[in-house]
Amino acid sequence: METVSVEEGLDFAPGMVSQKCLLCMCKLESGGCKPIGCRMDVGSLSCGYFQIKQPYWIDCGKPGKDWKSCSNDINCSSKCVQQYMKRYATHYRCPLNCEGFAREHNGGPNGCHSSRTLKYWELLQKIPGCKGVKFS
């Protein structure tokens, strides 16, 4: 599959999550869409552009060489997000828009329906260029 570059140097994998939505999620997760390595988050390590935890990487099909290197590679990590959404967003009948995907990413399986992921969506909407992001 072909990748789409939304900003110089950022080649997101294609899929059901729009490139704009991936960019907004990436900016929120890594403070500007950067390969920031791993850090502790709610008792376990979260890594890379999308702050992917190991169970998330396993659930997305273990793309790439390993969890940490995939998380710090923009194409591999965005492929993981796309595959995770293909697996869970449809299964849990999440809204197939940026809000549904962002909340599912933040909250895990069925996170799109959890009130605890609303704050994440509100934070994403405050990122310049991300307010009102739907599909494009």
From Swiss-Prot:
Gene3D superfamilies: 1.10.530.10. InterPro entries: Invert_lysozyme, Lysozyme-like_dom_sf. It catalyses: Hydrolysis of (1->4)-beta-linkages between N-acetylmuramic acid and N-acetyl-D-glucosamine residues in a peptidoglycan and between N-acetyl-D-glucosamine residues in chitodextrins. Residues 1-11 form the signal peptide. One of its GO terms (cellular component) is extracellular region. Glycans are attached at residue 75. Optimum temperature is 76 degrees Celsius. One of its GO terms (molecular function) is lysozyme activity. Its main location: secreted. Bacteriolytic activity against Gram-positive bacterium M.luteus and thereby probably protects against bacterial infection. Also has chitinase activity. May act as an ispopeptidase, cleaving isopeptide bonds between the side chains of Lys and Gln residues in proteins or in the cross-linking peptide of peptidoglycan in bacterial cell walls. Keywords: Antibiotic, Antimicrobial, Bacteriolytic enzyme, Disulfide bond, Glycoprotein, Glycosidase, Hydrolase, Secreted, Signal. It comes from the Eukaryota. Substrate binds at residues 53-59, 84, 92, 105-107, 119. Disulfide bonds join 21-98, 24-130, 26-33, 38-47, 60-80, 70-76, 94-112. This is Invertebrate-type lysozyme. Pfam families: Destabilase. Its EC number is 3.2.1.17. It is found in: Secreted. Chitinase activity is activated by high salt concentrations which cause the release of the monomer from the autoinhibited homodimer. The lineage of its organism: Eukaryota, Metazoa, Spiralia, Lophotrochozoa, Mollusca. Homodimer in its autoinhibited state. Active as monomer. Residues 14-130 form the I-type lysozyme domain. Optimum pH is 4-5 at 40 degrees Celsius for chitinase activity. The record marks 134-135 as: Cleavage. One of its GO terms (biological process) is defense response to bacterium. The active site is at residues 29, 41. Coiled coil: none annotated.
